[in-house]
Amino acid sequence: MALSRSSSPVETAVAALGNFLFRHRNKLFPVFYVLLFVPSPRLTGNLMTIMVSGFMISAMGQVVRIAAIGLKYIIRGGRKRRVYAEALVTDGIFAHLRNPLYLGNILILVGLGVMANSLLFNLVVSPLFIFMYAAIIRAEEDFLGKKFGEVYHRYITDVNRWLPRLSGLRETFESMEFRWKRVLIREYTTTYIWLSGTVLVTMRNLAQSPDNSFYRDHWQWGGYALGGLLTIYLVIRTLKIRKVITA
């Protein structure tokens, strides 16, 4: 949907809310993470189906983020906790989808919510998370429209906000260099967080299952997995800080 040149009062209010949420997003994200473990009625008793389905959703989000970062990393992390962008990025995965990093974040959290088998999280928390990103995106669109003008308005006319355009995706990957090192040093924290969440949610689900014999006999494997993920995280972080690996 194209962004209107003159914003309505509702759009202006949403953009203002988006700017507020953007400034405080680093405080809000841990809250959403903790809410995964709040006691709630279950979605289903079929634990295996819910775990596999949720993991696939989160993994899809990770793939979207990897594609966005590996092909073209966008510097849009904010300046002085305000929405900011150095340049308008329209190539790479951004030629097919305007907000791949945000879509990836949403899929990752929604997938974790499904894995948590939590009715409360899926009915309340996930929609709130999506709304939060919708407001942040509206604030970014307002900023980018003012900064880049007609170029940006043409871009949003051609490229969807949420749904990726699949046509030409193969040609995009073939025409651009994919930088795995950049993915590694930019994405290791996000990957560590959601994979650790997956392990914790799995352990909680197994412990609460009617037949928790598998958890009682193999609970230590969850600890091994968390320890392994933390080790990998610290190794990559150390290599990044010492500039052994650079983008």
Model-derived regions, located:
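Membrane-anchoring alpha-helices and their flanking helix-loop junctions
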Residues: 1-94, 106-247
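Short, conserved phosphate/pyrophosphate- and ester-handling motifs at nucleotide-, phospho-/glycolipid
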Residues: 99
